[in-house]
Amino acid sequence: TVTIDGKDVQKDPEEAKRAIGYLPELPPLYVDMTVREYLDFVAELKKVPKKERKQQIDEVMEMTQITDMQQRLIRNLSKGYRQRVGLAQAILGYPEVIILDEPTVGLDPKQIIEIRDLIRKLGENHTVILSSHILSEVSAVCDHIMIIAHGKLVASDSPENLQKLMSGSMELDLEVKGSIAAVKSALQEI
């Protein structure tokens, strides 16, 4: 049986889903809504109790540093702010597990640092699953990394240990047909 925060995904799928917050690489945002309208809409979908909604929305906007943007239409936000709105919707309802898919792709260096800091902070109170193909990005925010290739787990360790493993020497055996002079010439061009 699979459980999420003690909720059985087979017996109680709705409760299990509420225990997960998800930020896809390209968050599906309603660009004709203001930030606050969108977050209120998401809070309603997530069944955040009405009496807690305003406070939760205020808290997640503060956490993601979008409070000043709450009355702006999402269409008028930069990619960085749209990503923050996506992150805010993922943490609404305070789920136990937060899944982030490539949360810093396309952001400028300052935004990357800010989002990394926020992910670290979220990791203090939530289980954060970060999906990325950039090892340095994962190493910057995670204390444990699992590498999955073709649906199979191929490595699971701390960033430091994986870095050591991946920076080890590698040997490559080549069989080359041609003259030594031609091979040397081709290798020098690399």
Listing of model-derived features with the role each one plays in the protein:
Residues 87:
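Hydrophobic anchor residue at the start of the ABC signature
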Residues 40, 44, 51-69:
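Conserved ABC ATPase "signature" region
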Residues 94:
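Conserved catalytic motifs of ABC-family nucleotide-binding domains
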Residues 1-8, 15-16, 20:
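Conserved ABC transporter NBD signature motif
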Residues 116-190:
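ABC transporter nucleotide-binding domain
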Residues 98-102:
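Catalytic Walker B motif of ABC-type/P-loop ATPase nucleotide-binding domains
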Residues 73-77:
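Conserved ABC ATPase signature
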